Amino acid sequence: MHPRFQTAFAQLADNLQSALAPILADHHFPAMLTAEQVSTLKNTARLDEDALAFALLPLAAACARTDLSHFNVGAIARGVSGNWYFGANMEFLGATMQQTVHAEQSAISHAWLRGEKGLAAVTVNYTPCGHCRQFMNELNSGLDLRIHLPGRAPHTLRDYLPDAFGPKDLEIKTLLMDEQDHGFTLTGDTLTQAAITAANKSHMPYSHSPSGVALECKDGRIFTGSYAENAAFNPTLPPLQGALNLLSLNGYDYADIQRAILAEKGDAALIQWDATAATLKALGCHNIDRVLLG
């Protein structure tokens, strides 16, 4: 078990501990539960879906990287597939505050990058900030997405974001978590192809500036992130943050990164290179390359 989970795990009910122990035994537990695992945990712990999600929130919050605020927020995105995806906030010392990943963004991008097609609910241990409410409004679940908070009745995103502005106001039909493939040809080595594949998945209906990042760890594991734009612009999630989020959720540290590649168009309206390189260098990675999409 990764050390970050030990305190939260010890506070769980005995029957839930017994059911979770084999799942968490892997040091690189992927911070997600399959639909089958969720069903098993519900039956073993004798909890309904909402109660189980609340019980697991401390494990999600344990994934937080909060070197600046020391305020851990955890979230669980519940996919329409039945799979659950952990998320937690991430802060990057030496970078800028704008590079921060919020817990809801973490869980949602986690689900998206693993191929989830839509979300039914998000469970989070603190009220979503305005930034996250706007980020969630980009999803194909729209304002019907259920938000679950401890000690409160569940509400929809519509309740938390009245008079919402979103992609429909800009006549955008393809939403975040809808399947997208921009068709860029895969070239180069495995890591380069992974970055291009991530760029092909980008959600960028406002700038038309696709980008993807691939990070290779010292053990050969590769994590990718795709660019996810937002109708309000500022809640947009850069591709590097998506990749770093997956890397961290899987129990890796920034020191494990040995190489990084950004894929983007050289003549795009928005360029990720400077911000990507600066953040990676702040985290100790200097082997950074860029491939231009044709």
Swiss-Prot record:
This enzyme scavenges exogenous and endogenous cytidine and 2'-deoxycytidine for UMP synthesis. Binds 1 zinc ion. GO terms for cellular component: cytosol. Zn(2+) binds at residues 102, 129, 132. The lineage of its organism: Bacteria, Pseudomonadati, Pseudomonadota, Gammaproteobacteria, Enterobacterales. It comes from Salmonella paratyphi A (strain AKU_12601). It catalyses: cytidine + H2O + H(+) = uridine + NH4(+); 2'-deoxycytidine + H2O + H(+) = 2'-deoxyuridine + NH4(+). One of its GO terms (molecular function) is cytidine deaminase activity. Gene3D superfamilies: Cytidine Deaminase, domain 2. The active site is at residue 104. Residues 48-168, 186-294 form the CMP/dCMP-type deaminase domain. NCBIfam families: cyt_deam_dimer (TIGR01355), PRK09027.1 (NF006537). GO terms for biological process: cytidine deamination. This is Cytidine deaminase. PANTHER family: CYTIDINE DEAMINASE (PTHR11644:SF2). It comes from the Bacteria. Its EC number is 3.5.4.5. InterPro entries: APOBEC/CMP_deaminase_Zn-bd (IPR016192), CMP_dCMP_dom (IPR002125), Cyd/dCyd_deaminase_Zn-bd (IPR013171), Cyt/Deoxycyt_deaminase (IPR050202), Cyt_deam_dimer (IPR006263), Cytidine_deaminase-like (IPR016193), Cytidine_deaminase_bacteria (IPR020797).
